[in-house]
Amino acid sequence: MPVTARIDGLGELLDQQFSVVSRGQLLALGMKDTAMQWRVRAGGPWQALLPGVYFGLTGAPNLLQQEMAALLYAGPGSLITGPMALMHHGLRSQVMLETVDVLVPPGRQRLSTGFVRLHRTQRMPSRFVSSGPLRFVLEARAVADTVRLLTELRPK
C-alpha cells in the first residue's frame, strides 16, 4: 500500500477522537508503520503527541485533544482524574491545566511522559462519566485526587 493510500474508516475515527489516533488503531485499519512514519515526518501533515499516539493536524493540540491522546496512551480502562476531570464537572481548580492526570490499573506497563502523568491504582473506579470518547472519574474522586496532587506538588 502506498504511503498516501486512502484508509477506510480513518476519517471517521479522527472525527470521533478530536483528530487523535493511536498506532494500534491505525494498524487495525490496515495502515503500515511506514505510512505512519511518513505522515509524522518533519514537515508532514501529522505529528506524534506521545509514544504511539498521533495528531492528524499541524499546530498545537487543544485540551480535548491532549486528553484524548492521554487516554489512548494510557490504554483501555484508563480514566482522567484531577484538575482536568474537575474542569469537566464544572469545578475550577487553582492548578494549571498543563498536565493530564490519568488513572491506570496497577499492571499497566506505561510511564508518565510529556503532558501525561499516570497514577497506578488498585482501586480503579467502576463508575465514571463519559463525554464522547473521553472518560472521567466522578466528582468526589476528582476532588480527592486533586487535593492529593496539590499536597504532593507543594514546595517543601
Predicted regions and their residues:
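Short gly/ser-rich loop at a beta-strand->alpha-helix junction or flexible surface loop bordering the NTP-binding
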Residues: M1-K156
